[in-house]
Amino acid sequence: MPIPRSPKIRVKRLFKRYIQMKQYHKYALRYAAMAALLLSALTFTACGGDDDEGDGNQSGQVDKKNKNANIPSAANGYNKAIRRTEFPALKKTGKQKVIVYRMTSTSYDKDGVNFSVEWDCDKRSQRWTCYQMHKGYSGKYSRETDFFFFDTTNLNSNEYWGEYKYFPGYDRGHICPSGDRTASKEMNVQTFVMTNMQPQYHKFNGFDKKTGDNGLWVRMENQLRKWADKLSATDTIFVCKGGTIDSETNIITRIGGKLIVPKYFYMAILRKSSFGYAGMAFWSEQTNAWRTNETLRYHAISIAELEKLTGIDFFCNLPDDVEAQVEKTFNPSVWSGL
């Protein structure tokens, strides 16, 4: 005759099952959310029927002479998002993919755009991430976990290094930071896609609570966020950020002989307000050392200077006369905190 189980044993087993089911649902929801995010990116990357011209909360349509604007074509999937103000000129050689990550809601951006990436399929590396900063992207949501994932929807297995979900010896450095996307969980989680990452030294990308040191890249990101916090409801900051991957002299190494580690990182920044346009850029070598005492002003340059250093034509969708003026002019006095 079997010995009846005590109530305590039954309770323990039921509690164990409850915990297991809770964990299962937790990860199931994560993967479901990830799949939905990637499907959103795929749908709008490949489709050319949507209207993406202009800015998130500005009309921004190019209505003046513009010889170097991005033109939707078969090569880029007739993607009208490439006409947005934050976009630089697309690379015309090699195999590239422009991936536009979108949200299911258009409450934050009229086209639902979160951020966009130019991915070099030959180098298996991201060249840049571009995005907008305005009141619509700011909120109270903060990252819950470091849930990094590959974009297996938009990239084939031979277009990214699948064995490097972790960057040995380096941080997985966000190019569009999760801290710039706090209005919703959806937009924040999207920033953890690996196409938005570059290998960065922790002393460049991180911080030390004990010593109070902050990485130079983190300080630049924090300063950019402070500028965005001061925007009025109708102002926008347009950003294009990335690391150098196109020249061997601008690469530190390749992890495992494969994954590129950029030697330099940059930010091209364009602010549109009631006073008009203002532009500036950051350029810095990535080093494995705290540089807390270095001023941000030391690394601030004009957009025109950054274009010479990177070979990238930033904010090409602006009218030519506006672009020329804003890129050559850098006035530190209008950028508080430098």
Residue ranges and their predicted role:
Residues P2-Q20:
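Short, Lys/Arg-enriched N-terminal segments with co-localized hydrophobic residues
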Residues K22-A33:
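Bacterial N-terminal signal peptides that target proteins for export
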Residues A33-A41:
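Hydrophobic helical h-region of N-terminal Sec-dependent signal peptides
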Residues G48-L338:
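Domain-level detector for secreted/extracellular nuclease and nuclease-toxin modules, and
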